[in-house]
Amino acid sequence: MRKQERDALNMTLIALACALLMVLPLVTTFDDLLTAWALQLGVNNPLQAIVPVESRMVVGLLSAVGIKAAASGSHMVVWDGAGSMHVLLISWNCIGWQSLVLLGASFISGLRGHQPLEARVQVVLIGAAGTMLLNLLRVAAVAALAATWGQTAAVLFHDYGGTLLVVGWLFAFWLFVQRWILPADPSDQPELATT
């Protein structure tokens, strides 16, 4: 890679990092607003029913990378290298439902236009599956950080790193979708002059 290409890549990465940091307060505030609405509507009870299933899936992911973990209901236990046990509580608000709401909101603007139904279905399925997988990986990362680096690192990642992951995922998802799944709208193409 030439120096000019490397410099362009570095500037792009810096610009993306700045964009993510600028969006972070907006997304965090939006998540808090969604949480308040969910509590008022009573959505927290059905979401809490999902927590034990997600906890067991996270334990499976952690076991796959060699971290000893166990789950019981909404509690999860991870052991560090010294054999000390760390208890984590996974609540209805930690499972990532807000990221699915953000994804749904992005569908409203991202699927405007005249795309074929097949492409729209692919976008929705890939987006939902990717977001759910990201949420599992995010919770597993919090647990792994608690087991390896301690509670402070896990809390910081839970509060801020997870939000950055979701925003980064949405950017990457829409770049991928626009490039490879959604066909270009013919009205966006420049017209050729005919004589």
Q: Over which residues does each language-model region extend?
A:
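Hydrophobic N-terminal alpha-helices or hydrophobic patches in metabolic proteins across all domains
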Residues: 1-195
